[in-house]
Amino acid sequence: MTFLAIDVGNTRLKWALYTHPHRDAPLLAQGAEFLDNIDKLADGAWATLTPPTHMLGCIVAGDAVRRRVEAQMELWDVAPQWVVASAGEAGLTNGYDYPARLGADRWVAMIGAWHHAFSTGPARPLVVVMVGTAVTVDAIDASGKFLGGLILPGHGIMLRALESGTAGLHVPTGEVREFPTNTSDALTSGGTFAIAGAVNCMVQHLRDHCGTEPKCIMAGGAGWKMAPSMSVQFELVDNLIFDGLLEMAARRFID
Protein backbone atom coordinates (compact mmCIF):
# COMPACT_ATOMS: atom_id res chain seq x y z
CA MET A 1 0.00 0.00 0.00
CA THR A 2 1.71 3.18 -1.20
CA PHE A 3 0.71 6.70 -0.20
CA LEU A 4 1.11 9.94 -2.17
CA ALA A 5 1.19 13.24 -0.26
CA ILE A 6 0.79 16.47 -2.23
CA ASP A 7 1.30 20.04 -1.01
CA VAL A 8 0.17 22.70 -3.49
CA GLY A 9 1.21 26.18 -2.40
CA ASN A 10 0.94 29.54 -4.11
CA THR A 11 4.01 29.02 -6.29
CA ARG A 12 5.00 25.33 -6.23
CA LEU A 13 3.63 21.81 -5.97
CA LYS A 14 5.59 19.44 -3.75
CA TRP A 15 4.94 15.72 -3.62
CA ALA A 16 6.24 12.69 -1.74
CA LEU A 17 5.54 8.98 -2.22
CA TYR A 18 5.75 6.73 0.84
CA THR A 19 5.52 2.97 1.30
CA HIS A 20 2.40 3.43 3.43
CA PRO A 21 0.53 6.20 5.28
CA HIS A 22 2.38 6.36 8.57
CA ARG A 23 4.65 8.87 10.31
CA ASP A 24 7.70 6.60 10.07
CA ALA A 25 7.01 5.25 6.58
CA PRO A 26 10.06 5.03 4.28
CA LEU A 27 10.16 7.63 1.51
CA LEU A 28 10.16 6.15 -2.00
CA ALA A 29 10.41 9.33 -4.08
CA GLN A 30 9.78 13.06 -3.88
CA GLY A 31 9.90 16.16 -6.04
CA ALA A 32 8.64 19.67 -6.67
CA GLU A 33 7.38 21.66 -9.64
CA PHE A 34 6.47 25.28 -10.17
CA LEU A 35 2.75 25.61 -10.84
CA ASP A 36 3.42 26.58 -14.46
CA ASN A 37 4.94 23.13 -15.03
CA ILE A 38 2.51 20.79 -13.27
CA ASP A 39 0.86 19.76 -16.54
CA LYS A 40 4.03 17.79 -17.35
CA LEU A 41 3.99 15.58 -14.24
CA ALA A 42 2.19 12.59 -15.76
CA ASP A 43 4.71 12.36 -18.61
CA GLY A 44 7.65 13.32 -16.43
CA ALA A 45 8.39 12.79 -12.76
CA TRP A 46 5.26 10.71 -12.08
CA ALA A 47 5.52 8.47 -15.15
CA THR A 48 7.76 5.84 -13.54
CA LEU A 49 6.44 5.95 -9.97
CA THR A 50 4.93 2.97 -8.24
CA PRO A 51 1.19 3.69 -8.50
CA PRO A 52 -0.14 5.04 -5.19
CA THR A 53 -3.06 3.28 -3.56
CA HIS A 54 -4.02 6.31 -1.47
CA MET A 55 -3.54 10.05 -1.90
CA LEU A 56 -4.10 12.98 0.44
CA GLY A 57 -3.30 16.54 -0.50
CA CYS A 58 -3.30 20.08 0.79
CA ILE A 59 -3.98 22.93 -1.65
CA VAL A 60 -4.25 26.70 -1.31
CA ALA A 61 -3.86 27.60 -5.00
CA GLY A 62 -7.54 27.35 -5.95
CA ASP A 63 -9.89 25.09 -7.91
CA ALA A 64 -8.32 25.65 -11.33
CA VAL A 65 -4.94 24.39 -10.12
CA ARG A 66 -6.60 21.52 -8.26
CA ARG A 67 -8.26 20.35 -11.48
CA ARG A 68 -4.92 20.47 -13.30
CA VAL A 69 -3.33 18.32 -10.61
CA GLU A 70 -6.19 15.82 -10.70
CA ALA A 71 -5.84 15.59 -14.49
CA GLN A 72 -2.22 14.52 -14.03
CA MET A 73 -3.30 11.89 -11.50
CA GLU A 74 -5.50 10.15 -14.05
CA LEU A 75 -2.60 7.85 -14.96
CA TRP A 76 -3.31 6.04 -11.66
CA ASP A 77 -6.39 4.37 -10.25
CA VAL A 78 -6.46 6.47 -7.11
CA ALA A 79 -9.13 8.83 -5.78
CA PRO A 80 -7.83 12.35 -5.01
CA GLN A 81 -8.64 13.48 -1.48
CA TRP A 82 -8.01 17.06 -0.41
CA VAL A 83 -7.91 18.27 3.17
CA VAL A 84 -10.62 20.60 4.40
CA ALA A 85 -10.18 21.84 7.95
CA SER A 86 -12.69 20.32 10.37
CA ALA A 87 -13.72 20.78 13.99
CA GLY A 88 -11.10 18.26 15.05
CA GLU A 89 -8.72 15.66 13.64
CA ALA A 90 -5.62 13.69 14.62
CA GLY A 91 -5.74 14.93 18.21
CA LEU A 92 -6.24 18.63 17.48
CA THR A 93 -9.34 20.72 18.17
CA ASN A 94 -10.06 23.59 15.80
CA GLY A 95 -10.95 26.80 17.62
CA TYR A 96 -11.63 28.86 14.47
CA ASP A 97 -15.02 30.63 14.43
CA TYR A 98 -15.89 28.68 11.27
CA PRO A 99 -13.55 25.65 11.29
CA ALA A 100 -13.89 24.82 7.57
CA ARG A 101 -12.68 28.33 6.66
CA LEU A 102 -9.29 27.76 8.24
CA GLY A 103 -6.69 27.34 5.51
CA ALA A 104 -5.93 23.69 4.82
CA ASP A 105 -2.19 24.39 4.89
CA ARG A 106 -2.41 25.91 8.37
CA TRP A 107 -4.49 23.01 9.68
CA VAL A 108 -2.20 20.35 8.23
CA ALA A 109 0.94 22.15 9.42
CA MET A 110 -0.45 22.44 12.95
CA ILE A 111 -1.27 18.72 13.03
CA GLY A 112 2.24 17.90 11.83
CA ALA A 113 3.84 20.26 14.33
CA TRP A 114 1.71 19.02 17.25
CA HIS A 115 2.66 15.39 16.70
CA HIS A 116 6.30 16.30 16.08
CA ALA A 117 6.44 18.22 19.36
CA PHE A 118 4.57 15.52 21.28
CA SER A 119 6.96 12.84 20.00
CA THR A 120 9.94 14.66 21.50
CA GLY A 121 8.56 15.48 24.94
CA PRO A 122 5.47 16.11 27.09
CA ALA A 123 2.59 18.16 25.73
CA ARG A 124 3.10 21.91 26.06
CA PRO A 125 1.75 25.04 24.37
CA LEU A 126 2.97 25.40 20.80
CA VAL A 127 3.46 28.24 18.32
CA VAL A 128 3.58 27.09 14.69
CA VAL A 129 5.15 29.47 12.16
CA MET A 130 4.92 28.93 8.40
CA VAL A 131 7.08 31.30 6.36
CA GLY A 132 6.20 31.38 2.68
CA THR A 133 4.36 33.69 0.28
CA ALA A 134 2.31 34.55 3.34
CA VAL A 135 3.34 34.04 6.96
CA THR A 136 1.10 32.36 9.52
CA VAL A 137 1.71 32.29 13.27
CA ASP A 138 -0.67 29.92 15.05
CA ALA A 139 -1.13 29.08 18.73
CA ILE A 140 -2.07 25.70 20.24
CA ASP A 141 -2.54 25.10 23.96
CA ALA A 142 -1.24 22.07 25.85
CA SER A 143 -4.53 20.19 25.38
CA GLY A 144 -4.24 20.37 21.61
CA LYS A 145 -6.72 23.18 21.00
CA PHE A 146 -5.94 25.68 18.25
CA LEU A 147 -6.62 29.03 19.90
CA GLY A 148 -6.12 31.34 16.92
CA GLY A 149 -3.39 32.82 14.81
CA LEU A 150 -1.97 35.63 12.74
CA ILE A 151 -1.59 36.05 8.98
CA LEU A 152 0.80 38.59 7.51
CA PRO A 153 2.53 39.10 4.18
CA GLY A 154 5.77 37.30 3.43
CA HIS A 155 8.95 39.09 2.42
CA GLY A 156 8.10 39.17 -1.28
CA ILE A 157 4.61 40.60 -0.85
CA MET A 158 5.87 43.27 1.55
CA LEU A 159 8.54 44.40 -0.90
CA ARG A 160 6.22 44.40 -3.91
CA ALA A 161 3.60 46.40 -1.99
CA LEU A 162 6.16 49.05 -1.09
CA GLU A 163 7.60 49.15 -4.60
CA SER A 164 4.16 49.56 -6.20
CA GLY A 165 2.97 52.19 -3.75
CA THR A 166 6.10 54.24 -3.16
CA ALA A 167 8.22 56.07 -5.71
CA GLY A 168 11.94 55.33 -5.81
CA LEU A 169 11.87 51.98 -4.01
CA HIS A 170 12.71 49.69 -6.94
CA VAL A 171 15.97 48.54 -5.39
CA PRO A 172 17.86 45.22 -5.15
CA THR A 173 17.22 42.84 -2.27
CA GLY A 174 19.31 43.85 0.72
CA GLU A 175 20.69 42.25 3.85
CA VAL A 176 19.25 42.12 7.37
CA ARG A 177 21.05 44.70 9.51
CA GLU A 178 20.46 45.97 13.03
CA PHE A 179 20.94 49.53 11.79
CA PRO A 180 20.37 49.63 8.02
CA THR A 181 22.12 52.48 6.22
CA ASN A 182 20.72 51.99 2.71
CA THR A 183 17.25 51.49 1.27
CA SER A 184 17.77 47.87 0.19
CA ASP A 185 18.88 46.80 3.65
CA ALA A 186 16.15 48.92 5.28
CA LEU A 187 13.42 47.15 3.29
CA THR A 188 14.76 43.65 3.88
CA SER A 189 15.39 44.29 7.57
CA GLY A 190 11.96 45.86 8.05
CA GLY A 191 10.17 42.84 6.58
CA THR A 192 12.27 40.37 8.54
CA PHE A 193 11.82 42.12 11.87
CA ALA A 194 8.08 42.54 11.24
CA ILE A 195 7.74 38.75 10.95
CA ALA A 196 10.01 38.16 13.95
CA GLY A 197 7.96 40.64 15.96
CA ALA A 198 4.71 38.84 15.12
CA VAL A 199 6.22 35.56 16.33
CA ASN A 200 7.49 37.17 19.54
CA CYS A 201 4.05 38.68 20.15
CA MET A 202 2.25 35.35 19.74
CA VAL A 203 4.75 33.53 21.97
CA GLN A 204 4.12 36.13 24.67
CA HIS A 205 0.33 35.89 24.27
CA LEU A 206 0.44 32.10 24.56
CA ARG A 207 2.83 32.23 27.52
CA ASP A 208 0.47 34.60 29.35
CA HIS A 209 -2.61 32.54 28.42
CA CYS A 210 -1.22 29.14 29.42
CA GLY A 211 1.13 30.14 32.22
CA THR A 212 4.02 28.14 30.81
CA GLU A 213 6.73 28.57 28.19
CA PRO A 214 5.57 27.58 24.70
CA LYS A 215 7.57 25.61 22.20
CA CYS A 216 7.99 27.29 18.80
CA ILE A 217 8.27 25.35 15.54
CA MET A 218 9.04 27.10 12.26
CA ALA A 219 8.73 25.73 8.74
CA GLY A 220 8.16 26.86 5.18
CA GLY A 221 10.36 27.58 2.21
CA ALA A 222 11.77 30.80 3.67
CA GLY A 223 11.95 29.69 7.30
CA TRP A 224 15.73 29.38 7.26
CA LYS A 225 16.04 33.06 6.31
CA MET A 226 14.37 34.05 9.57
CA ALA A 227 16.62 31.99 11.83
CA PRO A 228 19.34 34.59 12.49
CA SER A 229 16.78 37.28 13.34
CA MET A 230 14.66 35.38 15.86
CA SER A 231 14.86 36.30 19.54
CA VAL A 232 12.78 33.35 20.78
CA GLN A 233 14.00 29.77 20.80
CA PHE A 234 12.53 27.72 17.98
CA GLU A 235 12.98 24.49 16.06
CA LEU A 236 13.22 24.60 12.27
CA VAL A 237 11.40 21.58 10.80
CA ASP A 238 11.42 20.46 7.17
CA ASN A 239 8.33 19.06 5.44
CA LEU A 240 5.85 19.98 8.16
CA ILE A 241 2.96 19.72 5.69
CA PHE A 242 3.99 16.19 4.74
CA ASP A 243 4.27 15.29 8.43
CA GLY A 244 0.71 16.47 8.95
CA LEU A 245 -0.60 14.66 5.89
CA LEU A 246 1.02 11.43 7.10
CA GLU A 247 -0.60 11.79 10.53
CA MET A 248 -4.02 12.40 8.98
CA ALA A 249 -3.64 9.62 6.40
CA ALA A 250 -2.63 7.11 9.08
CA ARG A 251 -6.05 7.63 10.66
CA ARG A 252 -8.11 7.95 7.47
CA PHE A 253 -6.70 5.03 5.49
CA ILE A 254 -6.89 2.08 7.85
CA ASP A 255 -6.98 -1.18 5.91
From Swiss-Prot:
The name this protein goes by in its record: Type III pantothenate kinase
Coiled coil: none
Pathway(s) annotated for this protein in UniProt: Cofactor biosynthesis; coenzyme A biosynthesis; CoA from (R)-pantothenate: step 1/5
Organism name: Albidiferax ferrireducens (strain ATCC BAA-621 / DSM 15236 / T118) (Rhodoferax ferrireducens)
EC supergroup of this enzyme: transferase
Alphabetical list of HAMAP family matching this protein: Pantothen_kinase_3
Subcellular compartments: Cytoplasm
EC numbers: 2.7.1.33
InterPro entries: ATPase_NBD, Type_III_PanK
Keywords: ATP-binding, Coenzyme A biosynthesis, Cytoplasm, Kinase, Nucleotide-binding, Potassium, Transferase
Membrane-crossing segments per the record: none
GO molecular function: ATP binding; pantothenate kinase activity
